[in-house]
Amino acid sequence: MMNESYFSYKDIYIEDGRKVLEVNMLPEKYCNFDCVFCPIGRSQHKTDVQRSFPGTDNSIVELENNINALNPDLIFINSKGEALLNDRIDDIIDLIKANGKAVRLFTNGYLLGRSEYMKIANRCDEVVGELKVLSEEDFQRLQRPIEGYTLAEYISNMAAFRRQYAGRFIFEITIIKGCSDGPGSIEKLKDIIREISPDKIIVAKINDKRFEKKFSITDERLEEISRALLDI
C-alpha cells in the first residue's frame, strides 16, 4: 500500500541513563551527499530540497503509538540520508515535543547554514553534525556532494549554526584512513573543533565490514587520535 508507514526503528537502548528510541524518517536514501563509504549505499535521490512522501500521516501516528508504548526519554532522528529533507519534519518534532520528549537530530551538517534548515534544527534539544575528511579533493572524491558544495562552506555552515544554537551540539568526527589520520590531521581537526566549538566530541572510525580494509584505521590509532582531540 502506498500510504503505509515508512518510518523504521531500532530497538530501545539506554544511553547515559536515558531510554533512546532511534527512528528513520525517510522511505529511501535522500541525501545531499553520495559518500563512497555510506553503509546505506548509493544515494537514489541526491538533493538538498525537501520532499513530500506518501504515508507520512500514518507514519506520524505510528511514531506517537511507539512513544506511548515504549515511553522513551529521547527520540533520536537518524535517517537513511538527510532527515531535514522530509518536508514534514516540523510536524514530527511538534509531535515529539507535545509528548514531552527530547529530540536529537542527526544531520551531515551541511544544510545547517541555511536559514530554513537552521530554524528546524534549532527546535531540537540536541543536534549531531559530522566530519569525515579534511581536504577539498577528498570531500569531492569520497563524499560526492551536490555540485557547488565545498569543504570550507561545510565547516562554516556548522560553525554558523553552533554560534546561534541554544541546544547541545555534538560533533562526530569519523577518522578515514589516508584522509584524516595523517601527521597534520590532528592539528587541522583541532582548528575545526575550535571553530565549531561543540558541546561534545565523538571520535569514530569506519566499522562497516565492506569498507574496513580501504578506509578504517586500527583501534590503537583511533585511541591515539581521540586522546589528542579530546585534550584541547
Regions found by a protein language model. Name each.
Residues 2-22:
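Short, charged low-complexity linear segments at domain edges
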Residues 16-58:
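Canonical Radical SAM [4Fe-4S] cluster-binding loop centered on the CxxxCxxC motif
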Residues 22-24, 39, 74-78, 104-106:
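Short, conserved beta-strand segments within well-ordered enzyme catalytic domains
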Residues 38-43, 71-74, 134-138, 169-170:
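Short, basic/glycine-rich phosphate-binding loops at helix/coil junctions
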Residues 41-76, 87-91:
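Conserved alpha-helical substructure of the radical SAM core
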Residues 84-215:
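Conserved AdoMet/S-adenosylmethionine-binding subsite of the radical SAM
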Residues 171, 211-232:
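Short acidic, glycine/proline-enriched helix-loop-strand junctions
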